[in-house]
């Protein structure tokens, strides 16, 4: 996302935001042969052949999809707080969603089921046993509780992703989560998603 600033009053500025689909890549005068291009990328000690990560959404990230994406050189990301750990019949749960597109009540009902740590561990282990890199997403509000569980289950990369991720997450009645300190306490690489400012990225 790119931004530009506009004055909206005395001493006030607003940032205009552009989505990626609103942008176009302008080619340069010189092109380069695909044989000379290397698409591999690295996160810590992990190497991937293609620069693609999946969004950790239940509608997309089934165990089979995650495994196949890893085999093709990308990185599939598991949503630890989604349906994987809530419904043993995952295909049946997804079929209910597909049968009623746009009906949010079904999604809310399915996500209201309690999270089964043993089931989530079993499904993460299924991906780990396939030989692909295991990446798991948790939300900022549940990171402190969920991160140790998914790492123990086999997560090799941890994503902390929400609609908006800040340097410190505060909730009434709970202990504030300082992301810099929290990330430093973990033994796996961490990627923050939903970061809207490069200065926040530098903090981590």
Question: In which residue ranges do the predicted regions lie?
Answer:
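Active-site entrance/lid segments in N-terminal catalytic domains of soluble metabolic enzymes
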Residues: 1-202
């Amino acid at each position: 996302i790119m931004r530009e600033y506009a004055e909206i009053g005395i001493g006030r500025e607003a940032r205009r935001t552009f989505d990626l689909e609103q942008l176009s890549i302008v080619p340069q005068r010189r092109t380069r042969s695909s044989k000379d291009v290397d698409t591999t990328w690295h996160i810590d000690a992990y190497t991937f052949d293609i620069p693609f990560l999946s969004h950790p959404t239940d509608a997309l990230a089934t165990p089979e999809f995650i495994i196949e994406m890893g085999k093709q050189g990308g990185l599939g990301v598991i949503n630890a707080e989604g349906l994987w750990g809530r419904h043993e019949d995952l295909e049946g749960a997804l079929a209910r969603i597909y049968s009623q597109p746009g009906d949010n009540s079904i999604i809310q009902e399915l996500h209201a089921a309690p999270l089964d740590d043993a089931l989530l561990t079993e499904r993460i282990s299924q991906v780990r046993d396939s030989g692909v890199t295991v990446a798991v997403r948790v939300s900022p509000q549940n990171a402190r509780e969920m991160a140790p569980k998914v790492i123990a289950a086999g997560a090799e990369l941890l994503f902390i992703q929400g609609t908006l991720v800040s340097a410190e997450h505060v909730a009434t009645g709970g202990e504030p989560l300082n992301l810099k300190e929290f990330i430093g306490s973990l033994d796996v690489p961490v990627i923050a998603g939903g970061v809207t400012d490069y200065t926040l990225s530098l903090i981590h």
